[in-house]
Amino acid sequence: MIDPAGLATLGTARLRFATVLGAALLATPALAADAGHATGAGPGTGAGDARAWLERMTRALDTRNYIGTFFHVSGPRVETMRIVHRDRDGRVTERLESLDGAGREYVRHSDGRLICYFPDRHTVLVATRPNGAPFLGGLPKFGAGVDRFYRIRELPDQRLLGHRVTVIAVDPKDQFRFGYRLWIDRRTAMPLKTELRDAQGHVIEQILFASLTMPARIPDRDLEAHVPTSGVRWIVQRPAGEASAGAAALRPAALPPGFRLTVAGAQTIGAAHRPAEHLVYSDGLATVSLFIEPRPQPRAPAATVTPAPVPAPMRGLARFDSGFAFSTVVGGHQVTAVGEVPAQTVEFIAHSVRAIDGRASPVALPTVLSHR
């Protein structure tokens, strides 16, 4: 059975670890020395400047080479991590390593493979994300339709650690998503500081870089995992087409405004290798993972065999450091929605799951339920 608490790490890290990184970056003077990658003063002042800065930041995160060590602060938890990102002729390879505790690592290959190493669980998870975003790609970016659900505006420039920065506010228009603040370096377009904020404006997640460099070349050895793999259990996420027929028939009948299906995959869970479908819904910034897992069924015991107990289903809301998970049971399946979004978003999606034609597209609500 899927553990909602573990989904914050294994599910959204996600198989989208990027949203875990939707928070604050503090760069060091090494950034200012990046004269070879300087992109000029950037956009001036005007109505479209905030969007232009988000577009430049997105390009910088996608296409630059960079190596950094940062502190990820989420609730009371602080974790030190190191990221290596290389773009070689449009082929991106990345490695993300936890420098604390168990020493977990994540490697994203240019062929779409995402390999997650969990030495504390003696497990390696292999997923396929053909068009997967970079690990820092969960930071806000401007895309078609995003401004229907967020107010995007430029705030007065500031100075941060000796750098001139442009400050961008991304505020939600309804109760289904969180907001952001970003401090973007005007020379390199890299985000030097960001914040993920709740509806009350409280900062709920941060990342602070202790070092950040952008070398012209990154050798292959810097992108190789350092975790021993002898004797570990390998879990391979299967393509979406191999999901069980029962799981494929379950879909949200409705979604919060702006959310749509962006990724569909399947994996096996537990020693019994039960199939679990993994669906990702996004509005362009916020992301929710939906896991649909067949519930184990009790078997008629043999005369001399005591039947194994069937675990109780998970139901209700659970909070992790910077988001929520909501679990329920639909048609004999455990359904769990998890994401760095308000509680009502995961509840809405999980509660809307119905047995429908797997080919049908869930519809978004026609209007935003409330505005701030």
Where are these regions (language model features)?
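N-terminal mature ectodomain segment of secretory-pathway/periplasmic proteins
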Residues: 2, 33-37, 44-122, 148-197
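Bacterial N-terminal signal peptides that target proteins for export
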Residues: 3-19
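Bacterial N-terminal signal peptides
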Residues: 16-29
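Acidic/charged, solvent-exposed loop-and-adjacent secondary-structure segments enriched in E/D, K/R, S/T
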Residues: 116-137
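Extended beta-strand-rich segments in extracellular/periplasmic secretory proteins, especially
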Residues: 140-197, 202, 231-279
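Pro/Ala/Gly-rich low-complexity, hydrophilic intrinsically disordered segments
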Residues: 208, 219-241
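Short, solvent-exposed recognition patches
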Residues: 232-333, 341-348, 367-372
